């Protein structure tokens, strides 16, 4: 392998300038280059705050799945006018205003949000009007790429496309609206994000496939909660896996995160306090640094979408000569970085644990690069990046419990939706049900389990 050429490519990708010949020295801490794992952004205005829930993401997602794009000129009034103006709608001028109001009242709620009467109307959920639309768009693209990658499961993707193409209805007004609805502009967007947690993806497909086959109405009515949960589930597991560095692997299963229930009280000894969102929070503290590290190493080693433990396997496949060349030019890159960032001393706080299966020299050089990034990344950028996962958690999965702080929490609505995905059509044995919860990332201590049993017994959902 030509590591010198890879080194030059890395310089280019990171906008490296050595400052010679009177120029200004510098480089950019770029992420999402050859290692694109999460849809997080580092600029506060662009970070999704979910003021309208997950609807903005679902609208973008539906359009991405069907290779459509939003028309920025559209508004609630424009949508109604476009429906009325279609040739299929034939009415006199005196009745036009009445029809406009009738359609508007049916299509939009009191907050002027679109009522999703049929799956095809997801396409017309508007973008956020401010810069947060970039953050929502990236999340939608991430969900499409990770969960609906047509290269991996063409049949599943086509089935979901058919779901969004449903323009049929027996209701006369809905039928009028759907027949008169206008086409959005076409735009195909290439894949961007890498998938690193196939176990979560496979569970998602299992659950969505069941609903597409057996209960599309339930999917339509609960799509916001289902997609928001799986986005948080995947993102948190992905973050925890990246944080394991060399110690990660794909065989370790789901990392346990304990939840409390919205309707129960909490004491200091509960598992969710010590093994809940605090783990995700800690892993996110230096996530930007780790994404920089992975982008640089993937680019330098001429690969894509690999985590640190996979890059170690890659290095171990090299012959002795390639290993030495790899280390030589990687050290050169670290020298470059330290030079343009004026880094003279390194903190030991950023050191990565090196297991026995990691080549000592490779581990030491990666550690040196990690420590260098620790000094070279702006703390404000690092902090803003760590807030991305907290935004979705605040909306659906966190509750302030006084002295215990914010802990992972499930509302009854969210809990019952995930329960329905676990149970499917038939009643289920209690032990099997808790196993299904844990497969989906929901872990409960004995106190929460007692509350769950009480609720499910009242709803007659489990076999005793």
Q: Across the structure, where does each feature detected by a protein language model lie?
A:
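Charged, amphipathic alpha-helical stretches
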Residues: 1-113
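Long, mid-chain structured domain cores
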Residues: 81-257
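Long, internal scaffold/assembly segments composed of regular secondary structure
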Residues: 213-347
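Long, low-complexity, charged/polar intrinsically disordered regions in eukaryotic proteins
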Residues: 324-407
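Positively charged, polyanion-binding regions of nucleic-acid-associated proteins
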Residues: 409-426
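Short acidic, hydrophobic short linear motifs in intrinsically disordered regions
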Residues: 426-440
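Short amphipathic alpha-helical interaction segments
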Residues: 442-455
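A short, conserved structural fragment
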Residues: 457-464
